């Protein structure tokens, strides 16, 4: 593994990439789901590609992606605009064609030398996604920033930062897929983008028909809790869940839950319990975990066009007092997670939009201990092919305050899930200890399997 001190990244001056053809000059409204306070932030992802001469015929990835971006923006022209605030801070998109920010860069390093430093929490993120001064605001700033960094091995890293009010993971994938198709020679995206944000406007009149714990202040909040503490000492680490960890966790689940329990559900229950223990929360205090649930697809019965690229999700919250969460077996937390996810349907999403309008776009609740988790293992970023084949890694690269993203990762040829966590430094040590304890195989199983066990932590 190379020492970080020897990495040198050379960047050219940022440039604005505009649509390749004239596009409509107009104002577009965001949906009431897009417009919530929770989404007014920038989300970074990273995609790492090996050299592949048999496929790319020595093409320059910077040139290919720059041109493909410009062509894709003809179809996704709102992303080349700027956000403005209207009355009551309502966001609108000024489709002025100013463009997205693009940075060409090169680094004197190979993918092999970078090793796991491209994985969450990615200590090199600022090198591969330069925060150009003045570009990271929500209002009046570029909605997308892309940096393409060529490596000495012939591979490259594409890092992207997106204003989350414009797209969710599924919407971003549509945009990236369109760019990739253009890079491989397509004349138009295979799935044409659909704006139609009015599909997720609040109803008239708005009416809250579901319980939304994610937006509610809870009783029993302690001023000494994590949410109200000084977060200047926050640290990030990533934790790996492979076959061994999942096997141990499943052994702790009651029979009636095993057949309906997903890997995501089980990891979420485990993290929620371990995090609550690590934060040493008042036993009477309410603690929550929210699962980001995509509204698309038949399962949730939300009727949206295939090319809809706006935010179409909710994050229903499971809630419990800290004491029963910590003292009960893992099945207690798991059942609460499953019940919260099951509340998500079209009515729930409509009720969220109505709540946001009626209550003036409240932030998610800031009282008590709160964790938000997002499953990106099936997001599809690993299938985006610009002409160099599939990426060796693709997805979110760090936890964002209370939000943790689950990403696919292969560890020693074993497929697993990597989860970055953000906690105060003292709590992080306790969290790792709790996680190791709950995923530790019994001694008799270790002897039977003739293998050692561990939970991987990456600083």
UniProtKB/Swiss-Prot annotation:
Highly expressed in the cortex and skin of ripe fruit. InterPro entries: CAT-like_dom_sf (IPR023213), Plant_acyltransferase (IPR050898). GO terms for biological process: alcohol metabolic process; fruit ripening, climacteric. The active site is at residues 164, 385. Belongs to the plant acyltransferase family. Keywords: Transferase. It is an enzyme of class 2 (transferase). It catalyses: butan-1-ol + acetyl-CoA = butyl acetate + CoA; butan-1-ol + butanoyl-CoA = butyl butanoate + CoA; butan-1-ol + hexanoyl-CoA = butyl hexanoate + CoA; hexan-1-ol + butanoyl-CoA = hexyl butanoate + CoA. The fruit of cv. Royal Gala exhibits a high ester accumulation, whereas the cv. Granny Smith contains low ester levels; this influences strongly the ripe apple fruit aroma. One of its GO terms (molecular function) is acyltransferase activity. This is Alcohol acyl transferase 1 allele GSa. Its EC number is 2.3.1.-. Involved in the biosynthesis of volatile esters which confer ripe apple fruit flavor. Alcohol acyl transferase that can use a wide range of alcohols as substrate, including 2-methylbutanol, hexanol and ethanol, to produce esters such as butyl butanoate, butyl hexanoate, hexyl butanoate, ethyl butanoate and ethyl hexanoate and, to some extent, 2-methylbutyl acetate (2MBA), butyl acetate, hexyl acetate and 2-methylbutyl butanoate (2MBB). It holds the Pfam family Transferase.
